[in-house]
Amino acid sequence: KASEKKKTNVIALELPKGKIITGKQTDLLSPASSVIINAIKELSKIPDEINLLSPTILEPILKLRKNNNTLSLQEVLIALAVCSVTNPSIASALEKLEVLKDCEAQATYIVTNGDLKALKSLKINLTCEPNFYSKEIM
């Protein structure tokens, strides 16, 4: 039905002081990428309207990929690391990744293997709803 909303994959993350941060799938980012960017922006007190990574940085990376339509968390972390060399705000935000250790996160879908590995490497505890990320899997 036209009146039904399109289902969006989302991850919610509880920060150490209890604030809940969410990340949803966008045209460029996976939900895991979005939630981590949003979390480090919150911890760094970077306003929501400021992009840590410009779409002009992300789009060429995405064009190199043929089998997926969003950038994984690992790809976004690499892009942040590269950009941090010339951008002190990004460098400061990346330092906040350590604060996410042992935080709890909940996904509305089964997180893809690549994002799952990246979240585990950040030591984030994740639970998932039993819904596939993509209908192509079914």
How would you describe each model-predicted region?
Residues 1, 45-46:
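Short loop/turn hinge sites at secondary-structure boundaries
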Residues 10-14, 18:
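Short beta-strand scaffold segments in enzyme catalytic cores
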Residues 1-10:
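Short, basic/aromatic recognition patches
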Residues 28-44:
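A short, polar/charged loop-to-alpha-helix boundary motif
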Residues 9-11, 42-43, 66-70:
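Generic hydrophobic/packing signal
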